[in-house]
């Protein structure tokens, strides 16, 4: 992981992060991805089984519905 990327505790660095990753908001109600290019970019993503909540914290998907 390059030094310029400081991922949080529940995140990991990937070379190809999706431009419109799943999060609590788009899991609860469909929202189309409006970012057309590039397809992906390096960055931090939530670890497996977790998504970002409205505050930007990685939480389990079930927590999105609480």
UniProtKB/Swiss-Prot annotation:
Matches recorded under InterPro entries: Ser_inhib-like_sf, TIL_dom
Any single GO CC term annotated in Swiss-Prot or TrEMBL for this entry: extracellular region
Residues annotated as domain TIL: 7-64
Disulfides per UniProt: 7-44, 16-40, 20-33, 24-64, 46-58
UniProt xrefs under Gene3D superfamilies: Laminin (2.10.25.10)
Pfam families listed in its UniProt record: TIL
Main localization (coarse): secreted
Molecular function GO labels: serine-type endopeptidase inhibitor activity
Record localization: Secreted
Source taxon at top rank: Eukaryota
Record flagged with keyword NAD: no
Keywords per UniProt: Disulfide bond, Protease inhibitor, Secreted, Serine protease inhibitor
Tissue occurrence: Expressed by the venom gland.
Family: Belongs to the serine protease inhibitor-like (TIL domain-containing) family.
Function: Serine protease inhibitor.
Protein name as catalogued: Venom peptide CtAPI
Organism: Chaerilus tricostatus (Scorpion)
């Amino acid at each position: 992981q390059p030094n310029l990327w400081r991922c949080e505790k529940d995140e990991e660095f990937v070379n190809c992060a999706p431009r419109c990753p799943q999060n609590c908001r788009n899991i609860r109600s469909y929202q189309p991805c409006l970012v057309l290019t590039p397809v992906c970019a390096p960055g931090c993503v939530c670890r497996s089984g977790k998504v970002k909540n409205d505050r930007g914290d990685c939480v389990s998907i079930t927590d999105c519905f609480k």
